[in-house]
A protein has these predicted regions:
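Transmembrane alpha-helical segments of integral membrane proteins
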Residues: 185, 417-422
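Membrane-embedded alpha-helical core segments of multi-pass
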Residues: 65, 118-119, 144, 150-154, ...
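Membrane-embedded alpha-helical segments in integral membrane proteins
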Residues: 30, 34-38, 91-97, 147-163, ...
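Hydrophobic transmembrane-helix bundles of small-molecule transporters
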Residues: 159, 163-268
């Protein structure tokens, strides 16, 4: 059976739709709370920064699970990892469905996140190992499109359910998906590949990333203790990186980062993902907090720009094959900076149609950045390091999303608290806070443009 699967035979093709459904479920669960943060903050009487742990905490656990997935696939096999992922999605959704308070809701989200980390890594590994080489790129693009579809559909569906049925009902959807996947997978999914052994060390990732995103989220509200926590998080992550370099069988092999071309390419991917995921949270907060829209309408306004991002991902891959990274990625960051600047100007008026259009421009720019930067970064390495580099990329995407979300929502939350304490109306405080976050985002996009120009120019000169 192994030979047949590696040749991309009927058995592998029969299992691919089920695994793509796993990718959809993972991405749907990942972004389902982006639209619900204001309601959660109001319901439980917590700040936006605290409510945002439903997103940032999710990313921390997902990043750890991605790093852990390679070990589990070797040790337990695909079928067992599939059941662990589905079980985590079902258990986490069940906890959140009946959560009586914020902390039980957060616990449910953290359990859900195990599913996202395991599925993202497992599906990519399955495609890389079992697709016919001539079809591998198509299958990877199909998986990326499935993930993008989940991210685009989730805000609309979640907003509709949240508006019509309330917060508890929101978690019935991923629970039903998990049960359906478990039932189908029990009969359809077959084991793939030999099993092995290895060591695992995820605790330092959880502690380091947790401290890092907490410090970023609170530093604008309570600077001194938050800076101490932030420094502790950086120190723990540094210890984790050192351990991965000296361990015989590391949880995450970081040696590809010794290649400067790969490291800078990954930096561009992370900067792009910080902007992309943060927009997916900040725009609903603006629509709901500053303009008073329902969660459903906020999700519907976000869906078009996110779909534009998914389409530009595909276009970006084709343009990369034709042109290379120059001038594609610098143009992408330029579009992103332009779109963010127009969003900031239009939001203060407010000019809703222009905000939506400009956010679509920013998302299109990000689509021209992330996938081409990832492909270019991987191409700087020998094939023997592709698997390790792919794990690094997947983990870094979750880390960047957590850092970006924590930073921007932390700024917005601090501004809303400060504004309302000065007597500003809640909507005006949200408007001012959103403008502040856009200024920071524009600065990051401009700095990213400069880095991408230097990187693309260097690669172009090397190729002659």
């Amino acid at each position: 059976m192994r030979a047949t699967l590696e040749a991309g035979g009927k058995e592998a093709r029969a299992q691919l739709p089920l695994l793509l459904a796993c990718s959809f479920a993972a991405s749907f669960a990942q972004s389902m709370m982006n639209i619900a943060l204001p309601q959660v903050a109001d319901e439980f009487g917590v700040t936006l920064s605290t409510a945002n742990w439903l997103v940032t905490g999710y990313m921390v656990v997902a990043a750890t699970s991605i790093a852990l997935a390679a070990f589990l696939l070797r040790r337990l096999g695909l079928r067992t990892v599939f059941f662990i992922g589905c079980g985590a999605l079902a258990l986490g959704s069940g906890l959140a469905l009946f959560a009586p308070n914020f902390w039980v809701l957060l616990a449910g989200r953290l359990v859900q996140a195990v599913c996202t980390g395991l599925f993202y890594s497992a599906v990519t590994s399955f495609i890389m190992a079992n697709s016919d080489p001539a079809r591998r790129g198509t299958h990877l693009a199909l998986n990326s499109g499935t993930v993008a579809a989940g991210l685009a559909v989730s805000p609309v569906v979640s907003g509709l359910v949240l508006t019509g049925f309330g917060r508890h009902a929101l978690f019935a959807l991923p629970l039903a998906l998990a049960v359906l996947l478990l039932a189908v997978g029990f009969f359809r999914l077959r084991e793939v590949g030999p099993r092995g052994t290895g060591a695992v060390d995820p605790l330092s990732v959880v502690l380091g990333l947790g401290a890092l995103v907490y410090g970023l989220g609170e530093v604008f509200r309570d600077p001194l203790p938050s800076l101490a926590v932030l420094a502790a998080g950086v120190a723990v992550l540094g210890l984790f990186a050192w351990r991965q370099l000296v361990l015989k069988d590391p949880l995450l092999n970081l040696r590809p980062l010794g290649n400067l071309g790969f490291a800078v390419g990954e930096l561009l991917v992370m900067l792009g993902m910080m902007a992309s995921f943060s927009l997916s949270i900040l725009l609903p907060l603006y629509y709901e907090g500053a303009l008073g829209f329902s969660a459903f309408l906020a999700g519907a306004l976000l869906a078009g720009p996110v779909l534009a991002n998914a389409l530009s991902d595909v276009v970006g891959g084709r343009l990369l094959d034709r042109w290379g990274i120059w001038p594609l990625v610098p143009c992408g960051f330029a579009l992103t900076a332009l779109g963010l600047a127009v969003v900031a100007l239009a939001a203060g008026r407010p000019l809703l149609a222009l905000v939506v259009l400009a956010s679509a421009v920013a998302y299109v720019g990000l689509g021209l950045v992330v996938a081409p930067s990832k492909t270019t970064a991987l191409s700087q390495l020998p094939p023997s390091l592709y698997a390790h580099a792919s794990s690094i990329n997947s983990a870094f995407i979750q880390i960047a999303s957590a850092i970006g979300s924590s930073l921007f929502v932390g700024v917005l939350s601090a501004d809303v608290l400060a504004g309302t304490s000065r007597g500003l109306a809640r909507a005006a405080a949200y408007d001012a806070g959103f403008a502040h976050t856009m200024e920071i985002a524009i600065g990051i996009a401009a700095a990213s443009l400069l880095v991408s120009l230097a990187y693309a120019y260097r690669l172009r000169r090397r190729r002659g």
